[in-house]
Design a protein with these regions (language model features):
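Conserved aromatic beta-strand anchor motif in extracellular beta-sandwich/beta-rich domains
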Residues: 113-117
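Residue-level signal for secondary-structure boundary sites
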Residues: 24, 100-102, 121
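Surface-exposed, low-complexity/disordered Ser/Thr/Gly/Pro/Asn-rich loops and linkers
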Residues: 30-91, 98-103
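Short coil-to-beta strand junction motifs in C2/discoidin
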Residues: 104-112
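Conserved aromatic anchor
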Residues: 16, 94-96
Length: 127
C-alpha cells in the first residue's frame, strides 16, 4: 500500500461513472479491480467494480488456481472522520451483486470489509 496525502471528506459516493477500467485515484489507493459496465446484471450504476479474479486489465490473475487465493481489493484513500461524534450516526453502505453476468461465487470465496485506523491496524467488520 502506498502513502496517500489525499484525505477524503464526507459524503463520499462513487458509482464509477466517471472512470473507465481503473478506480479514480482521487478516491482509491489501489486499482486491483476491473471497473466495467459488462459484468453487472441490471446495474444500479453506469459502471461497477468487479471482484471476480480478473485483474484491473480484465485478465485472470497469474496466480489464480482452483484453491483459494487472494485476488481483488479496493482500498479507499483515508476518510476524515475525526470531527464526527456518535450523534452523527455515520453509515457505510454499498451495493453487492454476487455473480451478475460473471462467474458464480464459490463456497470458498469471501467478501471482507475492513476499517483501518491511523496505526495501520485493521478490524474485520463484515465477512
Amino acid at each position: 500500500m502506498r502513502k496517500v496525502s489525499n484525505t477524503l471528506t464526507l459524503p463520499l459516493f462513487d458509482d464509477f461513472s466517471e472512470v473507465n477500467t481503473y478506480p479514480d485515484a482521487a478516491k482509491w489507493q489501489n486499482r486491483s479491480v476491473l471497473i466495467n459496465s459488462g459484468f453487472p446484471k441490471f446495474p444500479t450504476n453506469y459502471n461497477a467494480a468487479t471482484f471476480d479474479a480478473l485483474d484491473e486489465t480484465g485478465k485472470v490473475y497469474y496466480h489464480a488456481s482452483s484453491s483459494p487465493f487472494v485476488a481483488d481489493s479496493l482500498i479507499s484513500n483515508p476518510i476524515k472522520l475525526n470531527d464526527l461524534t456518535p450523534a452523527d450516526s455515520l453509515y457505510f453502505s454499498f451495493y453487492y451483486q454476487p455473480q451478475g453476468n460473471g462467474d458464480a461465487p464459490e463456497a470458498t470465496d469471501s467478501l471482507v470489509l475492513m476499517f483501518g485506523y491511523v496505526l495501520d491496524t485493521f478490524k474485520i467488520e463484515y465477512d
